Amino acid sequence: MLAGMLLCGGQLQASNRMTEMHVCLADAIQKDNRPEISNRLFRSNAVEKEILRVQKLLKNAKLAWMFTNCFPNTLDTTVHFRKGSDGKPDTFVYTGDIHAMWLRDSGAQVWPYVQLANADPELKEMLAGVILRQFKCINIDPYANAFNDGAIPDGHWMSDLTDMKPELHERKWEIDSLCYPLRLAYHYWKTTGDASIFNEEWI
């Protein structure tokens, strides 16, 4: 009898917790988790239009909410776009919460936006900047996988027993550190027809 009561009580608690979780999820779905517009690092009209287009196609509210918040996250929070001293686009892409740029990660982070490049000149220029920055990084050290935004040694891996230049964040060679920039450059060129990225920095 007691065991049955305890089991029933446990089931009731579990049921209550599930109800609370569903309420929290429902609240979250109504909430926009993107940064305020003024705090977004890069804005693309083509990306915003794509979000609205896909929202209408997704019948599941949770999936629509996830796409709305996740698809633009790289642009909102990690892309630092500017012009270099040579006047060419230069885009440094943080890898999440680490203020360094991984060759592999940055190539994957901006990949979904390439399909929209022809609809947004600023987005196209930003993507070209990612590729040009990747080429510069590889020319600094083809055996490094992650780079700082300039010659700013951050101290994390400077004591590694390898040739650590001040521009490097990590020097842990991976074959995909070279594959991803090549993949991104080819995809960008095939999509846009823009061959200007293949300049003197090109490998």
Question: Where is each model-derived feature located?
Answer:
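Aromatic-rich carbohydrate-recognition surfaces in CAZymes
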Residues: 99-127, 131-203
